[in-house]
């Protein structure tokens, strides 16, 4: 029994949900519009501003897809009403970020600046050259873009330099200790 899949999704008043062709749903709200094509064997209903997802049987595949579809629909409703945001912090001497022509340009200690194309449906803001705020309506796209940037220079364990999520704990290691000389 999928506990996630059986939960109903409450739809805010500002959000409009449209189910077409038994396997296509579009969710539109104040922040934008998202569309999703789900498995045709699932049944999705939208009654009285409440979305429910039902599966036809208890096959293992259907149980998996049931919970996943419900979670994706919930994220779509939240995304078009409130939106999603991830904040990254750049730590390191002379490490900085800037935006130029829909490109995020990062100076991360390499011999050249690294430029990353910003997707059309994301909004990226750089604060004080060391903080990157990524906003969007698609949770997966926001998380993917943030992870792609963190991967460029992961926080290293000795000084903590690199790109990290705000609030992320980076475990620090002790450096080499000086060699002790022994007197006999």
UniProtKB/Swiss-Prot annotation:
GO BP, one annotated term: cytoplasmic translation
Keyword field contains rRNA-binding: yes
Superkingdom of source: Bacteria
Pfam annotation, one family: Ribosomal_L6
Cellular component annotations (GO), alphabetically ordered: cytosolic large ribosomal subunit
SUPFAM superfamilies membership: Ribosomal protein L6
Record GO terms (molecular function): rRNA binding; structural constituent of ribosome
InterPro entries xrefs: Ribosomal_uL6-like, Ribosomal_uL6-like_a/b-dom_sf, Ribosomal_uL6_a/b-dom, Ribosomal_uL6_bac-type, Ribosomal_uL6_CS
Keywords of the record: Ribonucleoprotein, Ribosomal protein, RNA-binding, rRNA-binding
Chain's role: This protein binds to the 23S rRNA, and is important in its secondary structure. It is located near the subunit interface in the base of the L7/L12 stalk, and near the tRNA binding site of the peptidyltransferase center.
Subunit structure: Part of the 50S ribosomal subunit.
NCBIfam families (UniProt xref): L6_bact
HAMAP family: Ribosomal_uL6_B
Record-stated family: Belongs to the universal ribosomal protein uL6 family.
Protein name per UniProt: Large ribosomal subunit protein uL6
Organism for this UniProt entry: Onion yellows phytoplasma (strain OY-M)
